[in-house]
Amino acid sequence: MKRLTTITLILGLFLIANAWNSSSLVADDVEGTYWNAEKTAHIRMYKAKNGFYYGKIEHLVEPSNAEGTPKKDVNNPDETLKNRASLGMVIAKAFKWDESEQKWNDGTIYNPTDGKTYDSYIYFENGNKDQLKLRGFVLGMTWLGKTSEWTRIK
């Protein structure tokens, strides 16, 4: 009987320790620098003073165009923004942490390649904090979109 109690106690402690190790994410886990999916840029995810999370291009593998001048946001549909530098551009905006869903919702992601901004949410699949998944979609329909994966730079 004493042996059964000891085994039960050890098993209970093991389950508690296992639950502790697989604890849920916290909002600031997204902060850090990532390679984009194409491995052409580093994007730094950070928490702004307003409590939302943003992503800014901090490094470009090829920062200049063929003419040797810094790359610009030439595909932007807003004529006033076409001349802004790609380096330093904020492309992920206003993501809000949702504890219950374990993801950052209600943000937008700007794709400099096509000049379009998409509704978006971001998350770590299976708690893997080295691979940030971004789901961009249109018309509020999450199934009508594309998922991209950014890799954390350590």
Predicted regions and their residues:
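Positively charged n-region of N-terminal signal peptides that target proteins for export
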Residues: 1-4
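Conserved interaction-surface patches within small, structured recognition/assembly domains
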Residues: 121, 130-135
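N-terminal helix-cap/turn-to-beta initiation motif at the start of protein domains
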Residues: 21-33
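Bacterial N-terminal signal peptides
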Residues: 8-18
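Short acidic, glycine-rich loop/turn motifs
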Residues: 36, 109-113, 136-140
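Central antiparallel beta-sheet cores of small beta-barrel/beta-sandwich binding domains
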Residues: 31, 42-120
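A mature extracytoplasmic/lumenal domain signature
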Residues: 38, 47-49, 57-59, 124, ...
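Edge beta-strand at a domain terminus
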Residues: 129, 138-154
